[in-house]
Amino acid sequence: MFPAAPSPRTPGTGSRRGPLAGLGPGSTPRTASRKGLPLGSAVSSPVLFSPVGRRSSLSSRGTPTRMFPHHSITESVNYDVKTFGSSLPVKVMEALTLAEVDDQLTINIDEGGWACLVCKEKLIIWKIALSPITKLSVCKELQLPPSDFHWSADLVALSYSSPSGEAHSTQAVAVMVATREGSIRYWPSLAGEDTYTEAFVDSGGDKTYSFLTAVQGGSFILSSSGSQLIRLIPESSGKIHQHILPQGQGMLSGIGRKVSSLFGILSPSSDLTLSSVLWDRERSSFYSLTSSNISKWELDDSSEKHAYSWDINRALKENITDAIWGSESNYEAIKEGVNIRYLDLKQNCDGLVILAAAWHSADNPCLIYYSLITIEDNGCQMSDAVTVEVTQYNPPFQSEDLILCQLTVPNFSNQTAYLYNESAVYVCSTGTGKFSLPQEKIVFNAQGDSVLGAGACGGVPIIFSRNSGLVSITSRENVSILAEDLEGSLASSVAGPNSESMIFETTTKNETIAQEDKIKLLKAAFLQYCRKDLGHAQMVVDELFSSHSDLDSDSELDRAVTQISVDLMDDYPASDPRWAESVPEEAPGFSNTSLIILHQLEDKMKAHSFLMDFIHQVGLFGRLGSFPVRGTPMATRLLLCEHAEKLSAAIVLKNHHSRLSDLVNTAILIALNKREYEIPSNLTPADVFFREVSQVDTICECLLEHEEQVLRDAPMDSIEWAEVVINVNNILKDMLQAASHYRQNRNSLYRREESLEKEPEYVPWTATSGPGGIRTVIIRQHEIVLKVAYPQADSNLRNIVTEQLVALIDCFLDGYVSQLKSVDKSSNRERYDNLEMEYLQKRSDLLSPLLSLGQYLWAASLAEKYCDFDILVQMCEQTDNQSRLQRYMTQFADQNFSDFLFRWYLEKGKRGKLLSQPISQHGQLANFLQAHEHLSWLHEINSQELEKAHATLLGLANMETRYFAKKKTLLGLSKLAALASDFSEDMLQEKIEEMAEQERFLLHQETLPEQLLAEKQLNLSAMPVLTAPQLIGLYICEENRRANEYDFKKALDLLEYIDEEEDININDLKLEILCKALQRDNWSSSDGKDDPIEVSKDSIFVKILQKLLKDGIQLSEYLPEVKDLLQADQLGSLKSNPYFEFVLKANYEYYVQGQI
């Protein structure tokens, strides 16, 4: 498969161009690092462990935990090809022995540590592991369903019920198999071979199936060769629910194939040929690779959402063609005839990795160029950045049917890739890493041998050979992943008297080790890891930081890891001769020989990446806690990320230094002077500043100080005046964006799935406050740009500085968001609320000026991203853009934008706009107005919901007590709404009578005498609603001097409106009313008349009796007893008037008894 045919192509200048010419098997390839440092060369620096020491150390440990002796299978220059794990189970050996030469055997190596061999109608599943001495007796043989086609391991899938990372027992492993026709057989537990469920997938037509994949929630996806995907969900009842995954539901579906192709996104096509599928467990995403596109689905336990379909032909063909044939003079003619097939899809830390084969039929000789394309999935779409690595594997083209190469990427955290077919394996790199492994072909061409499949176990690449069984391919230990000079320096830093024996002799005695020694020993373990000696590295780590250690040990771990990371970041370039006299005698010991500062920074970034890989591999990452920084604790994992962010920022700053040396050098001198650094004569200020990367952020404040000085000194119309603002903005923006970009893109490297304890509040270095803090710097620059630069700038300069300022504000607000997310709302509510209030205020302070300056688009971009609804509403109001407001209501529906807008209208007194919302918003407006009934009736009338309006108005009238006039108006409006509604005749009559009763009561207040109101200084339009007792009191009070029988009769009528709940004795009040009426007349003499009835006929009391009689009231029941009336204290002096008593009794006899 991998002949040593020379490539006719000339390599390009970049590391991602075409293959090098004349490289055959075992050749040392180019490297992705600096020239002249082939990674395959021997390491000449001092080593920590000699081979003898390594063997003795292993034997003294008893049972080793990582690296083991294995039988070497084949010769290789750069790689160890050895048998993997324990010997194959007897059933597997028998199957291989009894199989005929032409029998199709396939293997599936599952990342959960199981291998599946398909041999004819049998499926053999067994447990695999790194250790050859572990007793692995688990081996099950299952019967496959009948099929007219060959059975394939691609149609076997295992699902695990135990959490990821745990050892899976047979009880926790479920197995599903499929045939190409669609027959399904499902074993809910591998422990029960005889217990299974069968089903058949019939999706119509003559489809055949190619892949079966275990996905979310114990379910599976069956993929047809035509790219139809079917979700299979086993149910507890024994049935297997099946449904087809949705197609073309992405954000651009429905806009047409021609239009969507402009975006690189296509609708599914019926003529697609499926090449590969991929399940991303971390993101719950499923990908399919076809002959023309990559499609993505987002899954939960029972449903799926189609995210997008990406046209790889349009997006990748030119990149691949250019990488291979780009240097040809007739390139434009060549690229029209290039053929490309997309063969396989895998994933690593850099993104999706596609294996593609390209050839041009007119080439002589015509070769197949295998390339690895890395693309990052940004969630809703693919990244624009594409990396094409053209491998050095380029066999002659024979037939398209013979292009059968496959890909495995065994370790997610690095860039090593393995291409394979039935006769050979080709080791290479994806080209996105900081170093390149030697590319080499490993042949399996012994008689009867072939490669049946490949996969990974614990990050180790595994090949299944027909003759040798499970085989691992690993880089030789003496090929360090560090650059040769850096690796040697690291070894020197931990080497000392008897350093080789010290590590194991000290740790095996289990004595207390000083913190400094722990750091040194951990460095030594890191060095061994870089030399691919994971076994020794793990042993050192296990001794230093036992998994059963106490809290003190874990805090020492945080200190040691942090110190090593800082040492890497602030390393002295000791082997640079200019630094020779300036390196402290006890420098940390990570020196490198790059004479160019930029390369020094890049090497430090590589070393940091290796350190993170090491921390993960040896099991320390999950134990990291917190470490103090800037006076407060920070999660150590995030502190490590901060170190890499500062390296990213320093690299960006160095690039600016190359272009803007005067500006950056001035700021560097200010920073170094503040630290009171003396610069050696043989070094530049930049040498000194960029060496200490941990302090790179100090330059930000210094840039502003220089900028302010220039703005004060330079004329406003000078080029220097404008350039200094633009350049300082650019440097700050690019540094902060580089840090933020690293934090987001490499999040998986520093993310902890489940934290055992709550982590401290996270304040990124890009969000520090106080003097010199980045937040302080941004606020200060915000003021400089808007108050100094902007007013004096022309329109072009204004556009430039505004765009830069928006980027700085974005970084500022993003820091607050990260900080807020780290505060636990439930346990620290007060802190969260205070921080959120601070954030909201700062957000408003930074964005509001953009509105004032009319920079609406920039203000909108930030306000939309950070959900500043106040800014968005203000902007729409200022520009009278109602359609944009409606869009925001939809866009931010889940964040209650509509409620915010309605509340804003209320607060600003814009009730007309509130009530003039389009019909589409009526539902939300109605919900909002439920809490604002004083307005909701207007919306209900506007919406012709008159019954609701009547009820709302009546409710408001019933609750109104503050203003009599308002209550009367609301009651009147309620009656009008009822009359205009669709109430039935009976219902309407009932409601009208209810309201008329209230109006009768209100009439008593409305008809209070004007003289009385003036006397009491009352006004009907401003009066509160009075209760019945209050009205009675007014009608019978002495100030009502003109009170007559009508007033007292009203007072008596009001007794009917006193509720039983009120603590008032109605009979006593009635007695008081009658007594007050009696007192209004003169009862001193008869005026010469003998008839008491005639004498009193004009008295108010008698006129009241006459009105009561006229109303048909039974006086004997209504009036109090005459004796009770005569004894009432309210009569005052009348109580002792004999004449009054005579006349009263006479009237009682005349009117009361006469009625009887």
UniProtKB/Swiss-Prot annotation:
Residues carrying Phosphoserine: 7, 15, 27, 41, 45, 50, 72, 131, 480, 489, 493, 501, 755, 1133
Any one GO CC term of the record: nuclear pore
Entry keywords, A to Z: Acetylation, Centromere, Chromosome, Disease variant, Epilepsy, Intellectual disability, Kinetochore, Methylation, mRNA transport, Nuclear pore complex, Nucleus, Phosphoprotein, Protein transport, Translocation, Transport
GO molecular function: structural constituent of nuclear pore
Region (Disordered) location: 1-39
Record annotation: effect of changing residue 231 to G: In NPHS18; decreased function in nephrogenesis; unable to fully rescue morpholino-induced nephrogenesis defects in Xenopus
Residue positions where Phosphothreonine is found in the record: 28
Job description of the protein: Involved in poly(A)+ RNA transport. Involved in nephrogenesis.
Disease linked to the protein: Nephrotic syndrome 18: A form of nephrotic syndrome, a renal disease clinically characterized by severe proteinuria, resulting in complications such as hypoalbuminemia, hyperlipidemia and edema. Kidney biopsies show non-specific histologic changes such as focal segmental glomerulosclerosis and diffuse mesangial proliferation. Some affected individuals have an inherited steroid-resistant form that progresses to end-stage renal failure. NPHS18 is an autosomal recessive, steroid-resistant progressive form with onset in the first decade of life. Galloway-Mowat syndrome 8: A form of Galloway-Mowat syndrome, a severe renal-neurological disease characterized by early-onset nephrotic syndrome associated with microcephaly, central nervous system abnormalities, developmental delays, and a propensity for seizures. Brain anomalies include gyration defects ranging from lissencephaly to pachygyria and polymicrogyria, and cerebellar hypoplasia. Most patients show facial dysmorphism characterized by a small, narrow forehead, large/floppy ears, deep-set eyes, hypertelorism and micrognathia.
Protein name: Nuclear pore complex protein Nup133
